[in-house]
Amino acid sequence: MPKQVKGLLGEKLGMTQVFDESGRVIPVTVVRAGPCVVTQVRTPDRDGYSAVQLGYGAVDPRRVNKPLAGHFRAAGVTPRRYLAEVRTGDAAEYTVGQEVTVEIFTPGQRVDVAGVSKGKGFAGLMKRHNFRGLPDSHGTERKHRSPGSIGACATPGRVFKGLRMAGRMGGRRVTVQNLAVQAVKPEENLLLLQGAVPGPNGGLVYVRTAAKGKANRDGGAA
C-alpha cells in the first residue's frame, strides 16, 4: 500500500515552554501551519507519480508572473506566495481548491520540519567547524584562530577536496527529523513542536509526516 504523507507549509513564530502531565518542562517551537489550499493534484496516469501541490501565504496578484497566474486561475484559487508538493499515495482523495489545516496532525505524532537555517555570513573555522584553534601563548603570533596546516608541500602538494575551511555559514535548507507534536490548536492554526526547528522567527517551514516512522509516545507508529 502506498505510503500516506501529510504535509503543511507554515511560519515559525518562536519558542516557548509547556508542562507535561508530570510537571516536566518541555521546550516547544510554535508554528503557524496553514491553512493551505490544494492548487494541483498529480496522478500516476498523467504525471507519473502521485502528489498534492499546496499553496500558502497571501501575495499581491500584481506580483505574480503570468504562468503562475494562469496556474492559479485554472485551479480556481487566489494566488499564493509559496507552493510545495507533498508526495503521497492518497493524492486522489484530495480535490483542487480544498483547504488543508493543522487538524491533519495529532498530539504525540512525529513529524519532520524543513526550513532554511539562519545565515551567519562568512565565518571562520572555530565558529563554523568548532576547531580548537592554535595555542594562546608559546610563540603564537596573530594566528590564534587559524586552522594550522592544510597540507604539506611536495606530498600531497595540494589541498584535499572537502577540507574543512572558513566560508559561508548557514542559510541552507535543513531538515530536523522526528519532532513530537505537543499540541494542535486548530482555532489558531498553531502547532506546538517539541524542540527547535530551523530558521529565524517568521521564516517559512515545511512540516510533514516523519519519514523514518519513529513510534509515537502512545506506542503507535507515526
Curated annotation (Swiss-Prot):
Q: Which GO terms describe its biological process?
A: translation
Relate the protein's function as given in its record.
Answer: One of the primary rRNA binding proteins, it binds directly near the 3'-end of the 23S rRNA, where it nucleates assembly of the 50S subunit.
Gene this chain is encoded by: rplC
* Region called Disordered, residue ranges: 129-150
Gene Ontology molecular-function annotations: rRNA binding; structural constituent of ribosome
Keyword list (alphabetical) reads: Ribonucleoprotein, Ribosomal protein, RNA-binding, rRNA-binding
Q: Which InterPro entries match?
A: Ribosomal_uL3, Ribosomal_uL3_bac/org-type, Ribosomal_uL3_CS, Transl_B-barrel_sf
Q: Where is the signal peptide?
A: none
- Subunit-level organization: Part of the 50S ribosomal subunit. Forms a cluster with proteins L14 and L19.
A GO term from the CC aspect: cytosolic large ribosomal subunit
- From what organism does this protein derive? Acidothermus cellulolyticus (strain ATCC 43068 / DSM 8971 / 11B)
The reply on keyword Ribonucleoprotein is yes
| Name of the protein in its database record | Large ribosomal subunit protein uL3
